[in-house]
């Protein structure tokens, strides 16, 4: 082979190799995917019985996370030199689920900061699930079945565990406190207990990042809620968003997860979330439906955020009180249309993201992208109006629903 021709072939080979490499999963990413899948499959296995707070399945999961923290080298921050912080389950949901006054536990560990060990950033995720569903199930038929709770929230727990390993290998300037909360499904009981008992003045956190439902990424999109809780969140996020993620900043809505008690305690707190889906709070929320490659992207982004936040001066990172709005969650027993709201929509009305086949909205001809403008005589300007309108409907009612499709308004009658 002559040299010029050989050089051309070699050059083409190099270019092709780079193109192929850019389209394949790198070894480090594949390793993270394997670890995430292992954690989720273990946590969401039927042997855990849905990880209901106060149950044997939840205790089993707590021990699993504790063992992982120990193997990873985290400092135990629970009671008596353990990783466990126990608390008692209370409230209406705990009573309805049959675990009233049962003991539950958070799992707490830390990687000390190399420069400012007295400064804390909290990275949290709730590891409890919906157990056998019951009053918190969104199943349309049998509610008394195991709810694997894979996306909600084995996904966030697994990402937190992977990040614990990363920070153990390369600590940040400040201490990172890793908190696996329980009792979230009963009203954020674990995170409330943590903020009341642990953050009691002797320990001060200047920022909190919550990972809840981060396993169903589509179109490289992730939303971050609660950025108005701190004066520097938006600036920090703008500096780190250099990858392919489409980050949706939901600044005006705090959300409803374990970052809320931190906000209420005066700590800037945000929430990573990859979106709602039809399997939410059902027995269909299973491990094989998760986007593990997307979860690696969430982990990468959250790591960048934490390392950037660790460089901030806590004195300049100031808390901002956000307005608390009613939770955009359908109460158990409320009649439903069989639609999934588009939580990213900022226009006037409630835009439909998904329609459940065979349910009321589907039978009435509604489609994804339709914008509900009124329901049961009540104007719908946002998701909160929509929830209130649903709660005004009783069984056997027939109500009118007005919706917009391609700038055209239409009205249908729906029977409940």
List the predicted regions and their residue ranges:
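Metal-dependent peptidase/peptidase-like ectodomains
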Residues: 116, 181-277, 291-295
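His/Asp/Glu-rich mid-to-C-terminal helical/loop segments that flank catalytic regions of hydrolases
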Residues: 278-324
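Alpha-helical metal-binding/catalytic segments enriched in His/Glu/Asp
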Residues: 109, 123-128, 134-188, 302
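Second-shell loop/turn segments in exported
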Residues: 26-29, 46-56, 94-98, 142-153, ...
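Extracytoplasmic/secreted proteins, especially bacterial periplasmic and envelope-associated proteins
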Residues: 31, 35-38, 42, 56-71, ...
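C-terminal recognition in membrane/secretory proteostasis and scaffolding
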Residues: 289, 310-416
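A non-catalytic alpha/beta surface segment that caps or lines the substrate-entry region
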Residues: 51-111
